[in-house]
């Protein structure tokens, strides 16, 4: 819970990101928080903050000006802070159909003022949604992005991002499918303490796609594709054999009933495996009913996905009347990634063994019928149900300032557990104006 009396409200002006960029913010081993964002004039930035010491100087660097000519949030940077301290920022040129992914690497550890020259990767189609992580088991950097709207491709680097493998197509959807892919790096307990896996969920566009099912799987650190229970499939990210993800081999998190659809909202970065989503009905493709979307969290238990009880209603769509598909976006959900109540200890099925240790927290942005709010919800029954913990931010509805996209930085702690966006929302159609907001509880 955030101590609102002690915490200080901080902001990054004119800052935005996208729902499908990863990682958007990372806490480095130096304790600093690094946030990637795009401005409403199309600039690509990385912000460095110290959430521990209020007297520490924050820094901000612009990596590219007028990227793609206008404020397309698809092009926001994904950032990766390597164990070496070097930082990689990757971003795209979505709106103009550019076939390049751009990236820059710091020349000095933890020093955003030393980003080297911009480098490029070329693809066979327009790019968007850069998702970048370090695979510490293989000593590699993994990079995912969507290409030509219907393909997801993977590259890896063995030298900290200096050179890259050829792209591997691992997910394809037919025209109109527009599949979305959301992946999180997870640390596992192992004898050497370095085991990792990459947990993902995929689904189709809520309005355009004909497939309204959320599915899940895992990439092991050796590239092997696993079902959610750990059962290997015959696909490996490293193998140049033409094999791709077979949707029928993945586990179904949520299958929309006839006449309904769903939004994938978050994928948990810690055990137990959890996926956040909101099903709803679109009575008219361009006038979705804001009373119907409801937030849920599904937990993987006993070899299957089990949805929670309804958590709360979303209350509104962010861009009603926009005809590019973004009218079906909601305020959003984010799983907490930190210490204590985040549930970093091994998940236990024993209901009598210290149940409070395994609580998990979700941050939710929504319209409560009167005001736009950012709230936290807690589960103490292993994700079966959630209760309201705290109203973190409240904006009167008549101000027409929306709250959306809560984000928990990778490796976040209680000093800065979450940040969110406030302003006007029109997604990638341009014309949005928003700021990043956060409460920070400094140690000194």
Which residues does each predicted region cover?
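Extracellular, repeat-based ectodomains that mediate carbohydrate processing or recognition
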Residues: 1-444
């Amino acid at each position: 819970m955030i101590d609102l009396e002690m915490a200080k409200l901080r902001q990054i002006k004119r800052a935005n990101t996208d729902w499908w960029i990863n990682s958007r913010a990372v806490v480095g081993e130096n304790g600093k928080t690094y946030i990637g964002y795009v401005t409403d004039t199309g600039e690509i930035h990385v912000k460095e903050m110290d959430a521990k010491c209020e007297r520490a100087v924050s820094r901000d660097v612009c990596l590219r000006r007028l990227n793609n000519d206008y404020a397309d949030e698809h092009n926001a940077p994904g950032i990766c802070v390597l164990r070496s301290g070097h930082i990689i920022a990757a971003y795209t040129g979505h709106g103009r159909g550019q076939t390049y992914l751009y990236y820059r690497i710091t020349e000095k550890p933890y020093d955003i003022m030393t980003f080297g020259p911009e480098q490029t990767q070329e693809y066979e189609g327009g790019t968007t949604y850069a998702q970048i992580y370090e695979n510490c088991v293989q000593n590699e950097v993994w990079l995912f992005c969507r290409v030509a709207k219907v393909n997801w491709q993977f590259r890896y680097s063995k030298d900290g991002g200096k050179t890259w493998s050829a792209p591997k197509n691992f997910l394809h959807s037919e025209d109109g499918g527009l599949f979305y892919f959301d992946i999180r790096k997870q640390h596992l307990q192992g004898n050497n303490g370095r085991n990792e896996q990459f947990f993902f969920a995929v689904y189709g566009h809520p309005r355009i796609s004909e497939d309204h099912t959320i599915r899940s799987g895992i990439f092991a650190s050796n590239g092997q594709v696993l079902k959610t229970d750990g059962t290997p499939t015959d696909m490996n990210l490293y193998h140049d054999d033409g094999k791709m993800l077979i949707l029928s081999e993945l586990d179904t998190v949520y299958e929309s009933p006839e006449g309904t659809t769903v939004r994938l909202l978050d994928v948990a970065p810690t055990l137990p495996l959890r996926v956040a989503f909101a099903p709803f009905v679109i009575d008219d493709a361009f006038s979705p009913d804001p009373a119907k979307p409801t937030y849920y969290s599904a937990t993987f238990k006993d070899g299957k996905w089990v949805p929670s009880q309804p958590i709360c209603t979303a209350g509104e769509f962010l861009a009603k009347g926009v005809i590019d598909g973004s009218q079906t976006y909601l305020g959003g959900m984010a799983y907490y990634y930190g210490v204590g109540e985040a549930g970093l200890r091994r998940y236990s099925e024993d209901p009598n063994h210290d149940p409070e240790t395994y609580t998990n927290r979700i941050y939710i942005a929504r319209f409560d019928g009167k005001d736009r709010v950012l709230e936290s919800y807690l589960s103490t029954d292993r994700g079966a149900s959630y209760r309201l913990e705290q109203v973190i931010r409240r904006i009167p509805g008549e101000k027409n300032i929306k709250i959306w996209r809560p984000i928990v930085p990778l490796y976040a702690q209680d000093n800065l557990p979450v940040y969110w966006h406030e302003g006007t929302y029109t997604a990638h159609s341009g014309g949005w104006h928003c700021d990043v907001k956060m409460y920070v509880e400094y140690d000194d």
